[in-house]
Each structure stands twice: as structure tokens, then as C-alpha cells.
Curated annotation (Swiss-Prot):
Protein name per the record: Probable cytosol aminopeptidase
Broad class of where this protein is predominantly found: cytoplasm
Function comment: Presumably involved in the processing and regular turnover of intracellular proteins. Catalyzes the removal of unsubstituted N-terminal amino acids from various peptides.
EC number annotated for this UniProt entry: 3.4.11.1, 3.4.11.10
Recorded catalytic activity of this chain's protein: Release of an N-terminal amino acid, Xaa-|-Yaa-, in which Xaa is preferably Leu, but may be other amino acids including Pro although not Arg or Lys, and Yaa may be Pro. Amino acid amides and methyl esters are also readily hydrolyzed, but rates on arylamides are exceedingly low; Release of an N-terminal amino acid, preferentially leucine, but not glutamic or aspartic acids
Organism of provenance: Bacillus thuringiensis subsp. konkukian (strain 97-27)
Highest taxon in the source lineage: Bacteria
Lineage of producing organism: Bacteria, Bacillati, Bacillota, Bacilli, Bacillales
Gene of this entry: pepA
Amino acid sequence: MFQVQKELASHEAVVVALFEEEKTSSFVQELDKAFEGQLQVLLEEKELSTKKKAISKVHSLGKTDVKRYYFVGLGKKESYTTETLRSALGKTFKTLQAAKVQDAAILLDSFVTEKLDAIDVAHIAAEVQGLGTYELQTYKSDKKDRVELEKFTAITAEDAQEIEAALTVGYVHGRATNSARTLVNMPPNVLTATKLAEYAVELAEKYDMDYKVLEKEEMEELGMGALLAVNQGSIEPPKMIALIYKGKEEWTDVIGFVGKGITYDTGGYSLKPREGMVGMKGDMGGAAAVLGAMEIIGELRPEQNVIAVIPSTDNVVSGTAFKPDDVITSMSGKTIEVLNTDAEGRLALADGITYAKKLGANYLIDVATLTGGVIVALGNHTTGAMTNNEELFEQVLEASMETDESIWQLPIFDRDKERVRNSKFADLNNSPGREGHAVMAGTFIGEFAEDTPWVHLDIAGTSESSGAHDLGPAGATGAMVRTLATLVERFGEE
């Protein structure tokens, strides 16, 4: 699909950057020779806009071998960022998709500045080509035909091999993020814990990873009472899923991802209202993020050791379901007083984290659609983070900045630990109250990470979008897939 060339050839569409300070850049001047100065007139008349994310279409009318040019406004160079580029190109690829373009090219060097080199631009272009044109997978009987972009050419004076590599990496990042989106969007009667495990096994086998899928009996033997408690009310069997990627000869410096895999959450006996229950098929967004990251890792083969653990079940009501006031024993041996059955994700993660440590994880990053509290605190565009290790958090933060997936650190104070340890009947309680809800949830999970370096990512606000945006339609976003993969790719770098 991707090609790299030094000269412009025949294409259906060519994408060109426009900055406010350089309305007559060398790229525009060169094109304007064929247009006999008409582009300059369009710029002066503001028919070609340099405003951020403005897209201006110009037909060549036979003056060149290119059918249409799409000029992409990027605003001022001083405010030009990777986020600006991602949004602008995402919108551009949506426009090309709507026009049913099958052969497009990008004047890569027109997007290059002192801040962003050609490799950065190539990576982002290939990544957002997939993200921006992602289409919601539905179960409607009337299927519409979709025209795909079949050929995408980067026009650049830079080294072709390096640009091709960047295009490939970007494409893999975008495709894997879309894989995660599709998982999150699937209905709960289709994506059960069993189906999620089957998907994970297929992924592991495709990329030659080791894997384990623990059944209920094995979980009982290992004492995974927290996950099993959440599963008590369900007719669907629980799964503890583990994918193991060995990127080094020695099993050291193992990064452990733990993704919440609650395939549907009614709240259990602490029942959600109807409006709060609709959409809870997406409560396995953390699991999807982890699997998406493992798809990237399997494709690109970084020299790191990685474990992905997914505790999976649904949380439903029945005569056998767990109840408020129950006391359960986790895999770690710590006992938990259940004060809220709708705080089930942290219970599943507790056993997931302990199992990841048992498999050899030296660093832990858990990802979960955990609390509504984080949405109140940070909104729908920022993931909440907590940690017991600032050095590890800094690496996660740097990865998130590279991928433009915003995160913000929330605190853990000793008084927060005291609140989750406040129980007359057990070592911990799973829900100290609504105050500081997001912090309480993360603090609870940290009790199981113990001294292992750990970062908690609450994606409740970022996992899904209520409306269409530059990088995709309404629905699942694939939050943290690219950040997790980038963390692994960059791990340990100075």
C-alpha cells in the first residue's frame, strides 16, 4: 500500500501543507508554475485557507497529472505540534475516504519543520490514515460497500528506506488501535470472556508468543478469589488470560500489562440505573488496549520482555452473585470486604496484578475503564494516572506525549491508603466512598502492586467518544494502545 518516491507522478489526489507564514512556500511555488499563478491568486483571495485543519480542494483541470490537490491548513509554525498534524491529517483522510480516493500521495516535506522531521510526519500520516478512516463495525443486515485507499505514496527527498520504515510503524500502530476499537464496540452477547480469550490466543499464535488461559478450576487452585467473586453470578466462565512475549534472551526487566476485561458490567447487586448500564459492553477497554499493544509488539518485535494479563468475566446479578458485605480472599492472600459490587474492576485487577507478578513482571502498568470519578476530575480527553514509582511514570508520560494521548497524574497519600485499609472484617475494603473515587480505586490496586514499580491508567473517560472526531467515529477510541506500545519500544532509553 505504501510507496516512497522523490518526484510527483500521476495520482488521484495529492496532499500539501499550508502554513500561515509560508503561503508561498517552495512547494506551492513549484505547483503554481503549472497553475500559471492561479494558486497565488487563490491564496490572496483566501480561497486556500491556512487556518488549522482547514482543507481546500483544487482541481488541476488537466494542468498536471494529478486530478485533485488537497491543501491542508496548519496555522502558524510556532504552534505546530504532532497533535495539530494528527488532527489535520485525520480530517484529510476522512475527506479522501468520502471522495472514494484510491490512489493518494502526500508531499511529505511540505509538512516538515524544525519541530517535526520527515520520519515523524511519515509515521503520523500512516497511523492516522487508519485511525481517521476507521468505520464502526455494525451488525446491520444492509451492508454498504466501502472504497479503500489502495495506494499511498510519500513524496520526499529524504532516505526512502527510513521513510518506508516509519510508514510501516505508523501503519501498525493505527491498525492495532483499530483492532482494540473493534473489540470495545462488540456487543456483550458476542464478546464473552471465552471469546476474548480465543481472540488473545489467535493473536499469540499469529505472533509466536507463549500464552496461558486459566479456567475456573485452575483459578480456584491458585486462590484467585477476587476475580472468582465477580464471576459468581454469571453463567459465562471466567478467564485469566496471559500473553508472554520474549524479546530478550534472558527473562529480565519484564514489563507487565494488566488490562481489565469485564465484558459487561451491570453493577451486580449494587445495580446501575438503566442509563448507567447502557454502554457497559465497553468495560473491557483496558483489555482491548493491552491486546492492541501486544499486536504492535508482535508485529514490530522490540527487544523487550512483556507480559499481558487480562482477568475477564462479566458482572451480573443472580441468586449466586456476590453481595455487599461479603468478605473474599484474593490471590495475594489479602482479604477484602465488599462494600460495593459495582467496584468490581479493581477486584479483577487485584488478582491480575498478583498473577502478573507470579509470571515474572518487574514493572506493572494496569489499564482500566475504572471510575466515573476520573471523568468528573479530568473529562473525556485525559487519562488519569497513579503510581508508586516516579521513574516508571516518567517513561509512561513521555510515551503518551509522543502519541498525543494525554495523561495526568493523581496523588496517593498515606491517608488514602488508610481509607482502603479501613475495615473491621478484612484487610481492605473495595469502596471507601464517593469522595476521591478515582484516587481510592487506584490506591486499592496499588495495595497489590506493593513494592513492584507500578503505574495505573484509568481510561474511563478516554476509552470512548460520544461523537465523531478527527481520528475516528463515535464509539471506542483505542485509548492507550499506542502509548503502551511506545513505552515498550522506548523502554530504558536515556
